[in-house]
Amino acid sequence: MRMNNIYISGTGLWIPPYGITNDELMESYNAYVKKFNTDNSEEIASGTIKELSPSSSEFVEKASGIKHRYVIEKDHALDPNYMKPLIPARDINELSLLAEIGVKAGKDAMKNAGVTADDIDAVIVSTANLQRAYPAVAIEIQNELGIEGYGYDMMVACSSTTFGISNAMADITAGKAETILVINPEITTAHNNMKSRESHFIFGDVCTASVVQLNSSSKNKFKILDTKLKTVFSNNIRNEFGFINHIENKTYQEDELLFKQNGRSVFKEVCPMVVQLIEEQLNTLNLSTDDISQYWMHQANINLNKWILNKLLDGDVDEKRAPNVLDEFGNTGSAGSLIAFHKFNHLEKGQKGLICSFGGGYSICSIIIEKE
């Protein structure tokens, strides 16, 4: 069958030009907190408004493992009077932001796969959040790269990258295409509340891409042995922003239309599901955890990954076997596991690895690959 000869034949990565350290972020956030508490001192004293608490780099690193993140714009994101990135609006005849960074990551993946636009049959943009409803960003990228065929957008929150690769594999298996470019533009700072102590430190911006191909001739190809997907509905990770807001009989505050999560519930509910899914997948393939040389896990929180890997592997796992990019990139939505794979892939011929994403939805996808 076709599905036995489908490969990830190349990956790509685009990184924004600006970085923010935890110390820089804390200086900004704590200045905002001080200003907020001063400006609202009477309301705080009367109990009508809750006083905000400052934060620290040490707290952030312990709680998440994050030390740094890349961002699309830095100055306004760190301005205590603004607290979000600010970018110029673009004319509809200009390439959109997501398409622009998607083209850059896509070209990197194409170069690493040894393919050209003429070789590609389809473009899938799969991301945690899209900047518009239509026309599809994938079709815009398709046009910019000069690719014939088709394109579409999809969103599965934190698992969008792996679900996108799985969709590409399904399209190839069905005979719709032979080579598909999957792109994951993640401008996560745009839907982050940087005024919130619980979330202001979490996100970073990035774009990843992968070439999924039938019968690849790439010198650095990885056969996809299996994909396993699972979704379970939950409101514990939620973003309310959407076109229905426009017609609802409600006036939303800005923070109501941004990322929200109940972190403790996510930890308690998602982590066991990830362990169960991976164990079931390995059992189906008659594999054990010892057969997996590397694990490229979702990069949301180092403590989640430690818990999952300790359960799977009966103890601590070294960073070479399960690379961590959280310290440099922060949570990049759905892109983290592919960043880890792109930067820290050390498989030798015949060795197997596992790429896994999980989070909002809830959604989980695990992809098992083998180096050829």
PLM ranges: what are they?
Residues N184-P185, N192, V232-E240, N301-I302:
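Acyl-CoA/ACP chain-elongation machinery
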